[in-house]
Amino acid sequence: VFGLHEFHTDRDDVTYVQCESEVHLLKEFLVFWEKHQPDIITGWNTEFFDIPYLCNRITKLFGEDELKRLSPWGVVYSKDIYKMGRNHQVYAIQGVAGLDYFDLYQKFTYTAQESYRLDHIAFVELGEKKTGNPYETFKDWYQKDYQSFIEYNIQDVEIVDKLEDKMKLIELCLTMAYDGKVNYTDVLGTVRYWD
């Protein structure tokens, strides 16, 4: 976990890197990313929130050349797509498959849910409830109780891990891609897999 303020944990499975500024944080993150270059990134709604936010901040603070460090091939591009009634900016990090668990869940589970918020899906699939935001906004939470704010974000990651442990949707995606001789993300479409 990378952050700007003090955070304390006794957990052996959580490492916290306290940074002096956003610039310092993103530099440390890029070094970590390159050292542990992922093949796949996942999370809940990462395609429309986490990845665009991260890419836009890196571009704004450092420029396009630093953004390219996310790709083992040095190629990152953005495009606008229309989904859920509005335009969204999304990024493709070449050489790193973005498998948004939100999309995997919608594609490979055949029961409509009343909500696709992670909290609801965690309750339906795992019997778990996420910690609620005790403040008016996430900004308030971040500013007034940084410790529990970071714990909440760790909980999000753990829920996606538990969903994968139970449902094996990434494993399914990889198996289908291997069998179909296509890229991992092609499995999320409707045509490419069958070509």
Predicted regions and their residues:
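Alpha-helical interaction scaffolds
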Residues: 1-26, 32-34
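Hydrophobic/aromatic beta-strand patches that form the interior of the parallel beta-sheet core
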Residues: 2, 42, 97-100
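Amphipathic alpha-helical segments that form well-ordered structural scaffolds
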Residues: 28, 53, 121, 159-163
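Proline-aspartate-enriched helix->loop->beta-strand connector
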Residues: 29-53
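Short secondary-structure boundary/capping segments
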Residues: 52-65, 178, 191-194
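Common nucleic-acid-contacting/processivity interface regions adjacent to the catalytic cores
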Residues: 139-195
